[in-house]
UniProtKB/Swiss-Prot annotation:
Subcellular location: Mitochondrion
GO MF, one example: zinc ion binding
Protein name per UniProt: NADH dehydrogenase [ubiquinone] iron-sulfur protein 7, mitochondrial
CC terms in the record's Gene Ontology section: mitochondrion; plasma membrane
Location of region: Disordered: 34-61
Sequence ranges of Pro residues compositional bias: 49-60
Domain of life of the organism encoding this protein: Eukaryota
Family, as annotated: Belongs to the complex I 20 kDa subunit family.
Free-text function comment from the UniProt entry: Core subunit of the mitochondrial membrane respiratory chain NADH dehydrogenase (Complex I) that is believed to belong to the minimal assembly required for catalysis. Complex I functions in the transfer of electrons from NADH to the respiratory chain. The immediate electron acceptor for the enzyme is believed to be ubiquinone.
Species, as recorded: Arabidopsis thaliana
UniProt cross-references to InterPro entries, sorted A to Z: NADH_UbQ_OxRdtase-like_20kDa (IPR006137), NADH_UQ_OxRdtase_20Kd_su (IPR006138)
Composition bias type Low complexity, residue spans: 34-48
Amino acid sequence: MAMITRNTATRLPLLLQSQRAVAAASVSHLHTSLPALSPSTSPTSYTRPGPPSTSPPPPGLSKAAEFVISKVDDLMNWARTGSIWPMTFGLACCAVEMMHTGAARYDLDRFGIIFRPSPRQSDCMIVAGTLTNKMAPALRKVYDQMPEPRWVISMGSCANGGGYYHYSYSVVRGCDRIVPVDIYVPGCPPTAEALLYGLLQLQKKINRRKDFLHWWNK
């Protein structure tokens, strides 16, 4: 009996120590960190809208400034449409119809359209007839001498796209390959009424310009 009590007294502390070590080891291996939500499952924050803003609108053109600018553009367009000065560039038989338009029956002067012999005094060029490869550099040089703003009227099938000589080795297939064209007048040759109609269409195009407004917004 004394032996049993002695063995129990010596083994009991060892058993307690081993149990404590096992418990401590099991506790250390427990996952105690809280799970984190992924960004996709996180709740979105809601901000309450504030009162309406009372700040002034961003700076810009006022109604009075827009009115004045539009009236200045209208005045400039009115002056330009009533005083078109074409540079005559007759190259073939279409030039005869261009002369007919300026004669007494149609009288281009009543529209303020006056032919000028110098490109420096002109704001419009009428390319009338067949444009050859040798004449193309001269056409571009005359166009570059015209002051801004400037416009070009292509008169006749040859000036529009080569016309009857479209497949010739020496003909430019359209003067728009050399200079920018604003109005195309079809015909071979076009009548004087057709050229007059093209000039009236050019006046409508000039009347839609907004040069002063574009300059003001820069």
